[in-house]
Amino acid sequence: YMIKLGSSAFISEASIACMMFLGNYVFIRHLGEDGVAAFSIACYFFPIIFMVYNAIAQSAQPIISYNFGAGQPERVRKTLHLAIRTALICGISFFILTVLCCQDIVSLFIDRSYAAFDIAVNGLPYFGVGFIFFAVNMIGIGYYQSVERGQRATIITLLRGVVFMLIGFFALPPVLGIPGIWLAVPLAELLTTFYIFGIYLKDRFIVCRR
């Protein structure tokens, strides 16, 4: 039972490695070594964002779990909405910070004289769009873990970290070019957000009909 419930957390951590592997493969094909160097900056930045969202999700989990077990659906709903609002505020803040301070962020990792610097400065704002949707996804995964829907949380994590990531990295570059590579991860996050909202609204509709 514990393995089943916690497998989504394991996959969520592993999905960062999957993102790095796929990203390196696609970036080196399209932009060479400079592209990989630019993408590595996003890979350094991404785990920081992950830890913030994970902290919010883990803070909400015991409250949601306790009230779910106590038969208090209204408190579960309020806690979920509070967690989503908090994560969204952080996500929007991270996105704005990425856009406004892009050059300063990149300069922390690489000198301005390298070609990778310009690639990263041009690409990070695209990549930063995903921070907003990533916030919702982490809360959604944590929510389904808390209400003993481990299988659902695992499916969401697999879609986000593998399936949608593959679609983004291999479908967008031929259509959008270089921006499409940077938008692959945001697309995966966006599709995951749509999926989470879809199943959440479906669950509420079924409950209302009962």
Predicted regions and their residues:
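Short alpha-helical transmembrane segments in multi-pass integral membrane proteins
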Residues: 1-6, 64-130, 171-210
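Membrane-helix interface segments
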Residues: 34-35, 150-152, 177-178
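Small-residue-rich hydrophobic transmembrane alpha-helices
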Residues: 38-96, 100-102, 134-156
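Short runs within selected transmembrane alpha-helices of multi-pass transporters and secretion channels
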Residues: 54-57, 127-146, 152-164, 168, ...
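Hydrophobic alpha-helical transmembrane segments in multi-pass membrane proteins
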Residues: 9-21, 25, 54, 86-99, ...
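Hydrophobic faces of transmembrane alpha-helices in multi-pass small-molecule transporters and flippases
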Residues: 1-22, 27, 48-52, 124, ...
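Helix-terminus/linker motif at the lipid-water interface of multi-pass membrane proteins
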Residues: 17-44, 48, 66, 104-113, ...
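Structural signal for membrane-spanning alpha-helices in multi-pass inner-membrane proteins
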Residues: 5, 20, 24, 51-54, ...
